[in-house]
A protein has these predicted regions:
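An alpha-helical, amphipathic repeat domain used for nucleic-acid recognition
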Residues: 1-146
Length: 146
């Protein structure tokens, strides 16, 4: 059977399996459905509604996982994390709530580690690097003073 001939329920089962493997947002699921060959926006809407109602998709859970992973594994700052979540078209309320729950100790520990690793660079170069990582000037100054 060709991919375009899959029924709504077969598309839904495929999307559920995708969501069961890792935390995803609605934009990720839609992108994946279109990669798989789904062309019908009505079926994509049906799948998205079902994934939300069956708790396969949850914006607050996704935002929390995204924020945790970006802080823990990639040492991103708040601004870069916020931009990444906005790019995924998540609700602003969920984004701000997830950003409020950042582990401050780990967050500023990462920033201090990045500052130490770039200590040989000029001050301007280090500031530019940390800004690209999403840290604010105030956060950088706060950790540089210590």
């Amino acid at each position: 059977m060709a991919k375009t001939e899959l029924s709504k329920l077969e598309w839904l089962a495929k999307a559920q399996a995708y969501c069961a493997r890792a935390e995803h947002c609605a934009a990720d699921v839609r992108r994946k459905l279109y990669e798989w060959g789904l062309q019908d926006a009505e079926i994509a809407d049906f799948i998205e509604e079902n994934l939300y109602s069956d708790n396969f998709l949850d914006d607050s859970r996704f935002c929390a996982a995204y924020v945790h992973d970006k802080v823990e594994y990639q040492s991103w700052g708040r601004l870069k994390i916020q931009a990444g979540l906005r790019a995924l078209q998540l609700p602003e309320s969920e984004i701000s709530q997830a950003l409020k729950n950042i582990d401050e100790i780990a967050y500023f520990g990462n920033l201090r580690k990045l500052i130490r690793s770039r200590s040989a660079d000029s001050e301007d170069k280090r500031l530019r690097f940390l800004s690209q990582r999403g840290y604010t000037f105030d956060e950088i100054r706060k950790c540089s003073d210590r």
